[in-house]
């Protein structure tokens, strides 16, 4: 399956994996700065953005990770950084675990932002989408802009930072054919039943890892980030103040310096 992606800049590659219901748009506030030193690959996960949305129901973390691994192989990516947010962070974790078994691990650093990683209570709107009848009807019952505004208000700590451009961009992606059905399937498979079994393998990740977490995340609790930091041996945990679940959109001025500092230090440690 050919997933849609956008590329910017030149240099060591960074592969970006967005969260649930999002697209490559979520990275728009960090692209300009990071593309000055790196080649950025902004992927739309299966069922999201401009990528295919087949009715095959294969929208789990594992299924998404297999597609990401195929892209890494196809493009022969080396000295690679993966950045994953929320659901995309869960995909990044599974991908990092798989790459550990490669003869030559191409992953040089991992950045996880407010990441799905363990069993946890899901937000009400995700639980609703998982229900057999309501999940099918709900996306069609309310105007898309209303749904997007509600979700962004939950995701942002300061909802004054939610702009009309954001709402328009998220809404446009959800209007694409097949998007609503793909969203429902992804919601139903967001946290796999064996997530704690998978989590037991996190200590096997030896790649230098930066874990960023919004101080007021109401979707994936900050305790998840702290637990993840303990589990991954070569990790650094940073709380991003004055932000919710999407700090790279809400306070990019706080996120960017941390990413740049981490990339510089992890590259320096390789020489």
Protein language model regions, located:
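Conserved HGGG/HGGXW glycine-rich cap/lid loop of the alpha/beta-hydrolase fold
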Residues: 6-50
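Short beta-strand/loop motif that positions the catalytic acidic residue
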Residues: 205, 211-213
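Catalytic active-site module of serine/aspartate enzymes centered on a nucleophile-bearing elbow/loop
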Residues: 235-271
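Alpha/beta-hydrolase fold catalytic core
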Residues: 1-14, 35-38, 73-78, 260-271
């Amino acid at each position: 399956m050919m997933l849609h992606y956008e590329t910017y800049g030149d240099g060591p590659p960074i592969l970006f994996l967005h969260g649930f219901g999002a697209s490559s748009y979520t990275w728009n506030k960090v692209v300009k700065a990071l593309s000055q030193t790196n080649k950025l690959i902004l992927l739309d996960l299966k069922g999201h953005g401009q990528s295919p949305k087949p009715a095959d129901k294969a929208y789990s973390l594992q299924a998404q990770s297999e597609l990401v691994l195929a892209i890494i192989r196809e493009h022969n990516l080396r000295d690679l950084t993966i950045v994953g947010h929320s659901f995309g962070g869960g995909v990044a974790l599974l991908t990092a675990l798989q790459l550990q078994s490669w003869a030559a691990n191409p992953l040089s650093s991992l950045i996880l932002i407010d990441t799905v990683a363990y069993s946890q209570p899901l937000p009400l709107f995700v639980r609703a989408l998982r229900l057999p009848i309501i999940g099918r009807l709900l996306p069609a019952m309310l105007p898309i802009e209303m749904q997007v505004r509600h979700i962004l208000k939950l995701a942002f700590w300061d909802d004054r930072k939610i702009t009309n451009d954001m709402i328009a961009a998220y809404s446009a992606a959800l209007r694409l054919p097949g998007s609503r059905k793909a969203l429902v399937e992804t919601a139903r498979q967001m946290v796999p039943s064996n997530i704690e079994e998978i989590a037991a393998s996190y200590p096997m990740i030896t790649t230098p890892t930066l874990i960023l977490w919004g101080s007021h995340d109401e979707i994936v609790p900050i305790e998840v980030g702290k637990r993840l930091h303990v589990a991954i041996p070569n990790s650094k945990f940073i709380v991003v103040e004055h932000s919710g679940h999407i700090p790279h959109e809400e306070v990019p001025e706080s996120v960017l310096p941390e990413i740049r500092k981490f990339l510089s230090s992890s590259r320096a440690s390789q020489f």
